[in-house]
Amino acid sequence: MSFFLTTPTAIDLGVNIDHVATLRNVRGTTYPDPIRAALAAEEAGADAITLHLREDRRHIVDADVRKLRPLLKTRMNLECAVTTEMLDIACEVRPHDACLVPEKREELTTEGGLDVAGHFEAVRAACKQLADVGVRVSLFIDPDETQIRAAHEAGAPVIELHTGRYAEAHDEAEQQREYERIVAGVQAGAQLGLKVNAGHGLHYTNVQQIAAIDGIVELNIGHAIVAHAIFAGWDNAVREMKAIMVAARVAALHGGAR
């Protein structure tokens, strides 16, 4: 729920500010300022601010994280890899949420979910390290029952289901299969008592079906909002995404969704 709203919304929006920083860094300037973008997003209805501190610092940098943390009125959702350096930074900054993600230096963006089952002990240790300093842990995983169960066993109270394959599907049949995987993943997570979020690759014309899924608490969206802001303005881009999500969820609750 946004700090600026007086009643809970049907579904929360976490606005990812990474690509505001990308635009800044590509020319080595001090603008556009991701801190300003984050605070404006809160005022426009964002329920959380998401940012990914990558090991290569290709967009968000350490100073962004440290400067933003005390300024937020909603929540900071800090995405980071399961490495000693990143976990130590997260424990120092103490965001409200830390979402552990896989990371490859050569990738353009995160390409898949964290393999919790395959790196179970490392992930479990990371969950404990963060929880011990009061940080709520989320694991960014594929909508796969094995990974969801491993996330629960590792001690994570939150999962974020990777929607990239749904978003990048080549045809309707493939997209429907991925949608059904996400629905099953949401149900599996809910049965284990996990808070279920979702994100990756969602934009203004594909988010509706995902936002309509009962049980998804929050969607994290960034690139599409930054891109739309070029034409609509930042505040409008955030408000429009939030409105689309809420409308889809309300319609689903009243029997209007597929």
UniProtKB/Swiss-Prot annotation:
Keywords assigned: Cytoplasm, Pyridoxine biosynthesis, Transferase
UniProt-listed Gene3D superfamilies: Aldolase class I
Record's subcellular location: Cytoplasm
Protein family per UniProt: Belongs to the PNP synthase family.
Lineage of origin: Bacteria, Pseudomonadati, Pseudomonadota, Betaproteobacteria, Burkholderiales
Main location per the UniProt record: cytoplasm
Recorded GO MF terms: pyridoxine 5'-phosphate synthase activity
The protein's assembly and partners: Homooctamer; tetramer of dimers.
GO biological process: pyridoxine biosynthetic process
GO cellular component: cytosol
Binding-site positions, 1-deoxy-D-xylulose 5-phosphate: 18-19, 54, 59, 109
Active site: 52, 79, 200
Binding site for 3-amino-2-oxopropyl phosphate: 16, 27, 201, 222-223
HAMAP family per record: PdxJ
InterPro entries: Aldolase_TIM, PyrdxlP_synth_PdxJ, Pyridoxine-5'_phos_synth
Catalytic EC class: transferase
Function: Catalyzes the complicated ring closure reaction between the two acyclic compounds 1-deoxy-D-xylulose-5-phosphate (DXP) and 3-amino-2-oxopropyl phosphate (1-amino-acetone-3-phosphate or AAP) to form pyridoxine 5'-phosphate (PNP) and inorganic phosphate.
Protein name: Pyridoxine 5'-phosphate synthase
E.C. numbers: 2.6.99.2
Signal sequence annotation: none
